[in-house]
């Protein structure tokens, strides 16, 4: 089971474009500028509750990538089940030489819910998640 929850009264809930779409469109909850050759974190205004052994993969929208040169850095962005109750953000990267304007309500990425399995001998660091975006360190 998985659910998206609005964090604000004006949050746009993720939506699948068609009944056979795998991805839920994720919407910007703020205006932003993705600088030329730069990257920013854009908030979505939603959080995602996931059962253990599920995660949300945040991936680029093909139209933004092809037509505008805007992609998602660290693709797929992995939102683990223990990331809840934090707001889902999207790391947008501009591959062009021109700043790109994001308006609140723009579709900026897709979220695909996946199930995963672990190994029989599951080695887990003795840590509790305190936030996201690199909170478990690099070493």
Where are these regions (language model features)?
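DUTPase catalytic domain/fold
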Residues: 1-139
């Amino acid at each position: 089971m998985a659910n998206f929850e609005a964090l604000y009264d004006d949050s746009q809930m993720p939506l699948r474009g068609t009944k056979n779409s795998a991805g839920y469109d994720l919407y910007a909850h703020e205006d932003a500028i993705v600088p030329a050759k730069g990257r920013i974190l854009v908030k979505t205004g939603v959080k995602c509750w996931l059962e253990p052994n599920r995660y949300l993969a945040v991936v680029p929208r093909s139209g933004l990538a092809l037509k505008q040169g805007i992609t998602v850095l660290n693709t797929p962005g992995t939102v683990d089940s223990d990331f809840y109750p934090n707001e889902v953000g999207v790391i947008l990267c501009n591959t062009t030489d021109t700043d790109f304007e994001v308006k609140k309500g723009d579709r900026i990425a897709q979220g695909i819910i996946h199930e995963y399995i672990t190994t029989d001998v599951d080695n887990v660091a003795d840590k509790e998640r305190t936030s996201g975006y690199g909170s478990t360190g690099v070493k």
